[in-house]
């Protein structure tokens, strides 16, 4: 009995697995400990990892690293790193580092770093330093540094932006680059500029009233708010 349990716990590799709904698959109850080159899941499949191609009607679940391409009608859930092309109808989740292109209809969740292209219909969220292009229909929420372009209705970055934020509301702790939006918020923008109707900068912000007469002798009153780089 001990030998049997031990053999099940050992990770194995197979060229292909076919699953109807776990554990009804060619890898059976040992699917979690088996990595595959090709994986086809009619409804729900569970793997130890994929290095190649995976197609799922509803849900792909991997408990190891994935590289290559993944397609799921609803969700891809990877408890490891992801490298390649990942596409789902609703939700992508990667607990390890992610690189490549990740597309989903609703929500991309990256618990650690994400580099490459992150596109979602509603929300992109990462937990580690990230880079590339982040496009979302509603919000990009990034908990650490980001290098590249963030484009959404709301962009919130809790680290340093080295690049550009474009949206209705943009917020970051430190700006090294450009914010373009209706409302731009930055704790520090010494190395950046904010372009918008309302620019709120906590440290070394530029704030001034200007009164002047134009050529027609009309009085012009202007209030400037933002960063020094925007007005110099």
For each predicted feature, which ranges?
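Bacterial Sec-dependent N-terminal signal peptides
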Residues: 1-12
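Surface-exposed, glycine- and small/polar-enriched segments that build interaction surfaces at terminal
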Residues: 10-232
């Amino acid at each position: 009995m001990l030998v049997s349990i031990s053999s099940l716990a050992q990770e194995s590799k197979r060229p292909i697995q076919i699953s109807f709904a776990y554990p009804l698959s060619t890898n059976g109850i040992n699917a979690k400990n088996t990595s595959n080159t090709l994986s086809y899941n009619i409804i729900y499949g569970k793997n130890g990892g994929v290095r190649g191609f995976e197609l799922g009607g509803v849900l792909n679940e991997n408990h190891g690293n994935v590289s290559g391409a993944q397609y799921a009608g609803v969700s891809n859930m990877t408890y490891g790193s992801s490298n390649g092309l990942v596409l789902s109808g609703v939700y992508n989740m990667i607990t390890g580092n992610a690189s490549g292109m990740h597309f989903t209809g609703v929500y991309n969740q990256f618990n650690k770093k994400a580099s490459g292209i992150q596109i979602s219909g509603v929300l992109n969220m990462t937990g580690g330093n990230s880079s590339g292009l982040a496009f979302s229909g509603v919000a990009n929420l990034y908990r650490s540094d980001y290098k590249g372009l963030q484009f959404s209705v709301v962009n919130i970055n809790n680290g340093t932006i080295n690049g550009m934020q474009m949206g209705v509301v943009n917020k970051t702790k430190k700006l090294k680059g450009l914010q373009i939006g209706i409302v731009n918020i930055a704790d520090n923008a010494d190395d950046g500029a904010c372009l918008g109707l309302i620019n709120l900068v906590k440290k070394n912000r530029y704030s001034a009233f200007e009164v002047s007469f134009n050529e027609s002798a009309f009085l012009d009153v202007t209030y400037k708010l933002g960063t020094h780089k925007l007005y110099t």
